[in-house]
Amino acid sequence: MEKNGNNRKLRVCVATCNRADYSKLAPIMFGIKTEPAFFELDVVVLGSHLIDDYGNTYRMIEQDDFDINTRLHTIVRGEDEAAMVESVGLALVKLPDVLNRLKPDIMIVHGDRFDALALATSAALMNIRILHIEGGEVSGTIDDSIRHAITKLAHYHVCCTRSAEQHLISMCEDHDRILLAGCPSYDKLLSAKNKDYMSIIRMWLGDDVKCKDYIVALQHPVTTDIKHSIKMFELTLDALISFNKRTLVLFPNIDAGSKEMVRVMRKKGIEHHPNFRAVKHVPFDQFIQLVAHAGCMIGNSSCGVREVGAFGTPVINLGTRQIGRETGENVLHVRDADTQDKILQALHLQFGKQYPCSKIYGDGNAVPRILKFLKSIDLQEPLQKKFCFPPVKENISQDIDHILETLSALAVDLGGTNLRVAIVSMKGEIVKKYTQFNPKTYEERISLILQMCVEAAAEAVKLNCRILGVGISTGGRVNPQEGIVLHSTKLIQEWNSVDLRTPLSDTLHLPVWVDNDGNCAAMAERKFGQGKGQENFVTLITGTGIGGGIIHQHELIHGSSFCAAELGHLVVSLDGPDCSCGSHGCIEAYASGMALQREAKKLHDEDLLLVEGMSVPKDEPVGALHLIQAAKLGNVKAQNILRTAGTALGLGVVNILHTMDPSLVILSGVLASHYIHIVKDVIRQQASSSVQDVDVVVSDLVDPALLGAASMVLDYTTRRIH
C-alpha cells in the first residue's frame, strides 16, 4: 500500500453529470478499476445522463461495465435560469442521503457545471475530501465562476496546463495539493487508432460521405447572454446550409436556452434536411473518430478548443463561450459571429485543412499521474483546507513558536565532486553544513543523501531550527514539477530519470523541491544576493562546469522542456574543444574548471606550468587553481589560457545580452573574479551599444547552490498559510 494514512483501500466516489464530463472521468474510473488492491470505486450518476431527450447516456456507463451505485434524478426541466438553480437545489436535497450511505474517503468532481457545484458543496459540508478535475482554466461565461467556486471547495486539484496550475496558485491554493497531470481524455485521444473509422463515419453521416468531407457542429447556449447565443446559432445553421456539406449536428447541453436552440433547429428543418444528421449523443470512442477525420468542427464547445487539437482538425470557435481557453493553431476564433457571411467565410478558410497535432492539454499520461496522486493522499492529515496568501503586513501580536524557533530549510547541493547538505535560515544564514564526496553510483548517492538529511534534520531540532522543507540543487536537466532529474551531465554518473522527491519526502515527511544548479544560483541571487529586487537578470555560475539561470519579470525561466539557461552550452566557436555535453566549442569547454584543469595538465606534462615561486606535490592532481596561480606569477601561457577562457565566457554573455537584454549579469562561482574584467572588455568590444550599459558583477554569495536550494523552500513558506 502507498501512503494514504491507514492500511485500507481508498474509497473513491466518482460522480458524473453529463456526456462531456464522463469522457474526462471514464479514463480515471478505468484506472481505478484496474487497481482493486488500492481503491474501492462507487459511481453516482445524475443530471442529464438520466434524461431521454439527452440520450439516456447513463447506458454508456453501464456498457463500459461500471456498476452504477446510485442514480439521482436532479434536473428540473424548463431549460431556463430558474430551472438551473432549482436543479442545484434538488441535488443538494438528495445528495446527503447518498453520501451518508456511501461514506467515501474522497469524491472526484469534474469541471464547471452547475451539477458539479452541487456535488462539491454537498461533499465539502459533509467533510468529504474533494478532488477537482480541470480546475484553474478560464473560458468566458458563468462556467468560470462555477469552476472557481468548486476550486475553493476542493481539497485537491488536477489541472491540465501550466497556465491553469498558475491560476490555481494565484487563487491561493496549496501548491502541494495541485497536480499538473494533463487532461485524462488525452490518454484516450492520443492512443485512439481505429482502422475501421470509415464505418463509423458512414453510420452517423451516410454511406456516400468521404473522409475530411463533412462537418461536426456542436453549439451550446451562453447562459449570460441567451438571446445573442440563440441568434448566433441561427446564423450558424444558415451558414452551414449555404456551405452545402454533410454536417453532424449534436443537440446542445441542458443549460438555460437549450430549448430555444432546439426550436431553431426544428424551425429550419435540420432533423429532416438531407445534408444534416441531428443526434442527441455519440459515444465518445466514436465521437473522437468523427472529429479526427472531419473537414472541420464548428461551434462553441470546449471539446473544439481542447480535445480536437490532438488531431489537428480545423476548428471554428464561435462567440465568447471559450474566449479564455488556451488553443492551438487549428482554432479560428469568430468572436463576433454576428452575420451569416462572417461564419461562411470562416468555413471557407478552415474546411479541409490539416494542422499539426497539438498537445497543449495533455501528453497521454494523465491517468497514471492521477492514480499516483490519489495513493499519496494522507487521510490522517487535517481535513480543513489551508490557503496560501501572498505576503501581507504581519499582525503586531507575537507567536511563541516564532520567538523560540528559527524557520529554516534543508538545502542539498549535488555537485560534480561534492555532496553538501546545510541547514539554512530564513535570512540566508547557513547554520550548519555537512560535506561528503559525491559517490559514483546511484544507490550509494541516494543512501548518502538520505543519511545526511536525516542527520541534519536531527541536528536542526537541537539547534532549535524548524525545518519547513527540503530544496535540492543538482547538475543536469530537471523537471521541477515532478522532482525528477531527467538527464545529468557526465560529471554525475547514473543520474538520469531519477525521482529525488519521493524518497526524501517519504523519509523526512517534508515537502521537497528540486531544480538545476544554475537555476538555484539565480534563485539565490533573487532572494539573498545582488539580484534582489531586480526584474530581469542572468546568473552565470562558474565551477567544475558552467551553469546559469534566467530571471525574467521576477520569475525563473525553465523553458518548455526544462532546458532553458543551459548557458554553459552556448557555442562560441565552430571548431572549439570537445564539451562534456557531446558538442564542441561550448563556453564550458573553454571556461569551466574542467577545461582549465585540462589545459593545466597539458602545460604540466610539457613542463610549462611551474614558474618560480610555485610547486605541485607529486600526490596532488594538477587543477585549475594551479593554472591561476601560475598566471598570477607571470606564466604567459597560463595567462593566455585564462584570457581565452574569459573571452569565451564574455562572448557567451554578449549573446545573452542580445537575446534577453537583462539589466544585470551576475558571475558566480570560484572562477568569477578571475573572469570579470575580461568579460567586461569583451562586452565593450563586441556588444551593440544599446546593451553596453548592463551591470556585470561578481556574486557576493559564498554558497549560491545551497542558498538557491533553500530559497525554493523559504520563498514558498513566506506566503502566509491559513
Curated annotation (Swiss-Prot):
PTM (free text): Phosphorylated. Phosphorylation by PKC activates the UDP-N-acetylglucosamine 2-epimerase activity.
Pathway(s) per entry: Amino-sugar metabolism; N-acetylneuraminate biosynthesis
Cell location: Cytoplasm, Cytosol
Annotated control of activity: The UDP-N-acetylglucosamine 2-epimerase activity, in contrast to the N-acetylmannosamine kinase activity, exhibits allosteric regulation by cytidine monophosphate-N-acetylneuraminic acid (CMP-Neu5Ac), the end product of neuraminic acid biosynthesis. Moreover, the activity is contingent upon the oligomeric state of the enzyme. The monomeric form is inactive, while the dimeric form selectively catalyzes the phosphorylation of N-acetylmannosamine. The hexameric form, on the other hand, demonstrates full proficiency in both enzyme activities.
Primary localization: cytoplasm
Amino acids binding UDP: R19, S23, R113, H220, N253, V282, S301, S302, E307, R321
Parts forming coiled coils: none
Binding site for CMP-N-acetyl-beta-neuraminate: K259, E271, K280, H281
EC number: 3.2.1.183, 2.7.1.60
Region (N-acetylmannosamine kinase): 406-722
Annotated function: Bifunctional enzyme that possesses both UDP-N-acetylglucosamine 2-epimerase and N-acetylmannosamine kinase activities, and serves as the initiator of the biosynthetic pathway leading to the production of N-acetylneuraminic acid (NeuAc), a critical precursor in the synthesis of sialic acids. By catalyzing this pivotal and rate-limiting step in sialic acid biosynthesis, this enzyme assumes a pivotal role in governing the regulation of cell surface sialylation, playing a role in embryonic angiogenesis.
Protein name per Swiss-Prot or TrEMBL: Bifunctional UDP-N-acetylglucosamine 2-epimerase/N-acetylmannosamine kinase
Naturally occurring in which organism (per UniProt): Cricetulus griseus
